[in-house]
């Protein structure tokens, strides 16, 4: 397949490496146009992939079979809209990011839209990307009209396993959102690795109760206990990890809070549900962000 990967951060480089190794034709797409992008990845087994790949070639984009978007949630909408007119109208766009809410911003996109969520963990260490842990990627249609692209899951399964297709991806996205609503803000506020959250079961349960109430009103069956158990599993499995939001806060970058607890707040408001704990966490992270964004440009840069 011919694939353009939009966003060449940790997750983007992980996919570029895996696609290259399987013989797919790939290019990266960078915010600041460059003729190539450097991919420098250390795999979980310690092997190194170090290549310069084509980047920002509009002719390549115009003949791509897939646009894989691995940007931060707040970067997605502007970036995808800027490329949509060059991309064939039949080429699916697969979004893989934390949080929810980008689909609502892309309702007018004509290409098939797919949503994904992944438990693969990768982080930047200087100029190198470390593939910290293998995981599973769930993908499915973002909107009712987006159809069956399960063949993509089969192809991507051979590239970076495991990949699973869901006709109802929204339920999976909500489960992942519950995890993100707990782990990301709490670790960002307390400046701690994921495992430290084990010591705060009441706080976790409080957040899960609020998230479960919203998920039920969204039409997906769940319970606070189920969500809590799932969150605790993820905390145990990723105990040593530094969450993406804490990494952003430490690097004085814009976080994805608007698409995590912020998205939950918007859906809660639509259903008339009070979510005081999620509101408190959202406001605390926004306050942290504003402290350094005021000192910098005052505004997050566009993608």
Swiss-Prot record:
The keyword Oxidoreductase applies. It holds the Pfam family ApbA. GO terms for molecular function: 2-dehydropantoate 2-reductase activity; NADP binding. Its EC number is 1.1.1.169. SUPFAM superfamilies: 6-phosphogluconate dehydrogenase C-terminal domain-like, NAD(P)-binding Rossmann-fold domains. The keyword Cytoplasm applies. GO terms for cellular component: cytoplasm. GO terms for biological process: pantothenate biosynthetic process. Keywords: Cytoplasm, NADP, Oxidoreductase, Pantothenate biosynthesis. Catalyzes the NADPH-dependent reduction of ketopantoate into pantoic acid. This is 2-dehydropantoate 2-reductase. It comes from Escherichia coli (strain K12). The lineage of its organism: Bacteria, Pseudomonadati, Pseudomonadota, Gammaproteobacteria, Enterobacterales.
């Amino acid at each position: 397949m011919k694939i353009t990967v939009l966003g060449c951060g940790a997750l983007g480089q992980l996919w570029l490496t895996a696609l290259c190794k399987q013989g797919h034709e790939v290019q990266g797409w960078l915010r600041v146009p460059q003729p190539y992008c450097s991919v420098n990845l250390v795999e979980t087994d310690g092997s190194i992939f170090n290549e310069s790949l084509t980047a920002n070639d509009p002719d390549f984009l115009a003949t791509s079979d897939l646009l894989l978007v691995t940007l931060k949630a707040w970067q997605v909408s502007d970036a995808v809209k800027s490329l949509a007119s060059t991309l064939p109208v039949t080429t699916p766009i697969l979004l893989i990011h934390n949080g929810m809410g980008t689909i609502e911003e892309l309702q007018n996109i004509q290409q098939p839209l797919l949503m994904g969520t992944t438990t693969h963990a990768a982080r930047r260490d200087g100029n190198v990307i470390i593939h910290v842990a293998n995981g599973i990627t769930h993908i499915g249609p973002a909107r009712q009209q987006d159809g069956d692209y399960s063949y993509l899951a089969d192809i991507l399964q051979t590239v970076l396993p495991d990949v699973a297709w869901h006709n109802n991806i929204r339920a999976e996205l909500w489960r992942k959102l519950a995890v993100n609503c707990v782990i990301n803000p709490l670790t960002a506020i307390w400046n701690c690795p994921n495992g430290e959250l084990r010591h705060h079961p009441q706080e976790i349960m409080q957040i899960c109760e609020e998230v479960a109430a919203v998920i039920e009103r969204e039409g997906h069956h769940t319970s606070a206990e189920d969500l809590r158990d799932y969150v605790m599993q993820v905390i145990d499995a990723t105990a040593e990890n530094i969450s993406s939001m804490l990494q952003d806060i430490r690097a004085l970058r814009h976080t994805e809070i608007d698409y995590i607890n912020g998205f939950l707040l918007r859906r809660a408001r639509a259903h008339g549900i009070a979510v005081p704990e999620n509101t408190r966490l959202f406001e605390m992270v926004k306050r942290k962000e504003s402290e350094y964004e005021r000192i910098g440009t005052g505004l997050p840069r566009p993608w």
